Amino acid sequence: MITIPLPFQIAFVIGILFIIFNNKHQEQYQKSIFLLLLFQIFFLPLIAITRGSTLYDAIRQFLFILPGVAVLATVGIVRIYDILKKKFLKVLYVTVLLAAFSVIAYDMVQLHPYEYIYFNRISGGLRANASRFQTDYWGLSLNKTAEWLNKNCPTGSSVVVASPNECLELLLSNNIKLYKARYRKRGDWPPLENGDKFKKPFYYVAIRKWILQSAFPECPTVFKEERMGVPLSLVKNCVTNSKEK
């Protein structure tokens, strides 16, 4: 729930409570829809948890619950508006909603085009959760990283990537040699199984996953694609470092 904005969480709870306490006034088909939504949101994830299913990498395995959450949150928002009878209360309510949504919109603008790494403010936002959860899982930030490499790497440069390399394979110039480093399990050091096999000079690229960005600490970081102070992907220059040695 830390990736769902707080106003929607509150509206979601209100929507559930409203439907429960107004059960007698609902048609049979409405009751059936509500039960299906609850099944989708709660029962299916509960089965996965109780069966000890392997769950990893944030919410991506439970994306199917979000449509149901959105429906019930909308019910909550609309019903609150309907309950308010006085005009000034309705205006105040809409104003509060607009203010709350404006904060969410501001955060999305700050994250663009990586809106999918959003964490709500009550959980501390992206900066507080970046070390606990996946951020740029799909490596979208490697697009900007590739642009930087194409612009700044001399012809014939070697690039070692410990991240999803498919993006770089498509975007890197043909004049740059790309090598993929296998990484060990979280907590191991060094994180690259074959990192010692790469002879400098080279550039090292890593997304924010496990401790991959901590590899080659002797090499200075020359580029970061970051949002809200969190580096999503980075480039380390092990070319300059090798020349100095």
Kindly label every feature range from the protein language model.
Residues Q40-A58, A105-P113:
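Transmembrane-helix signature of polytopic, lipid-linked glycan biosynthesis machinery
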Residues Q9-I16, F42, P67-Y81, F101:
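Transmembrane alpha-helical segments
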Residues N23-Q26, Q30, F34-L38, I77-F119:
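Signature aromatic-anchored transmembrane alpha helix within multi-pass, membrane-resident enzymes
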Residues T54-Y93:
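Repeat-solenoid scaffold signature
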Residues Y93-W148, N165-E169:
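Membrane-proximal, lumen/periplasm-facing interface regions of secretory-pathway glyco-
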Residues K177-K245:
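Aromatic/acidic, Gly/Pro-rich catalytic loop(s) in extracytoplasmic/lumenal soluble domains
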Residues M1-I4, Q28, S32-L36, A48-L66:
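Membrane-interface catalytic loops of GT-C/OST-like multi-pass glycosylation enzymes that act
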